Curated annotation (Swiss-Prot):
Its biological purpose: Regulatory subunit of the error prone DNA polymerase zeta. Involved in damage-tolerance mechanisms through translesion DNA synthesis.
Family as reported in the entry's similarity comment: Belongs to the MAD2 family.
Presence of keyword DNA repair: yes
Superkingdom of the organism of origin: Eukaryota
Annotated GO biological process: DNA damage response; DNA repair; response to UV-B
Protein name in UniProt: DNA polymerase zeta processivity subunit
Species name: Arabidopsis thaliana (Mouse-ear cress)
Keyword vocabulary terms for this entry: DNA damage, DNA repair, Nucleus
Gene3D superfamilies: HORMA domain
Domain HORMA: 10-193
């Protein structure tokens, strides 16, 4: 890969990270996890979106999204999930972003074209209230990254921001609900919902994934 291709790949990664920060905020708003007054309307990519008012919430989302950048640039990120849990730490709903970036094609796309494509995801999210399920009482949520290989602790400051989680995993295949997909060069992106199947047992197993440190 040439230096120019590497720079272009970095631009794609930064655009994707900025988008992820906005999309995660919209998902949390969509779920009604916090009162609507905890958010304020802003415009991003010419779409009306939500921005967290509370500094700690805003910083957590920003840190989770921006912390993905070095791993996205290295092609390590396979999926990013916004996971909602019951009080027993059992996942009840996952918003999954499946990511593939083709660095060799990054120089072929203009930033405006990429933003236009990502804009359609934000528009779709804003009208997806009917797809989500009500949250249980005393629930919580987190951002989880599924990596193709785990970074070694101490290998970089970025790696230290992420820790393996003890999140329980469904044993049966989940119920999938597609939301939006993009299949282009250099970015392929899928957004879909996962819910546990009706036959899901109560005893769940732990996966190989990582989550950012709590703020």
């Amino acid at each position: 890969m040439s230096r120019k291709d590497d720079n272009q790949s970095g631009e794609v990664g930064r655009t994707l990270v900025d988008f992820m920060e906005v999309a995660i905020t919209m998902i949390v708003y969509l779920k009604g996890f916090y009162p609507s007054a905890a958010f304020e309307r802003r415009r991003y990519m010419n779409v009306v979106v939500q921005r967290a008012r509370h500094p700690e919430l805003r910083d957590y989302i920003h840190s989770a999204a921006s912390g993905l950048l070095p791993f996205i640039e290295k092609g390590l990120v396979e999926r990013v999930a916004v996971v909602f849990f019951s009080e027993d730490n059992v996942p009840v709903e996952r918003f999954i972003f499946k990511i593939t970036i083709k660095p060799s094609c990054a120089a072929l796309v203009e930033e405006g074209q990429l933003e236009f494509a990502l804009r359609s995801f934000l528009i779709k999210l804003s009208v997806s209230k009917s797809l989500v399920k009500p949250l249980p009482l005393n629930c919580r949520w987190e951002v989880t990254a599924y990596l193709r290989s785990l970074p070694q602790v101490g290998s970089s400051k970025e790696a230290e921001l992420w820790i393996p989680t003890d999140t329980k995993q469904w044993q049966n295949p989940p119920v999938l609900t597609p939301v939006k997909s993009l299949n282009s060069e250099p970015l392929c992106l899928q957004l879909y919902l996962e819910h546990p199947s009706l036959s899901e047992p109560l005893n769940l197993v732990n996966p190989e994934d990582v989550a950012p440190h709590d703020p």
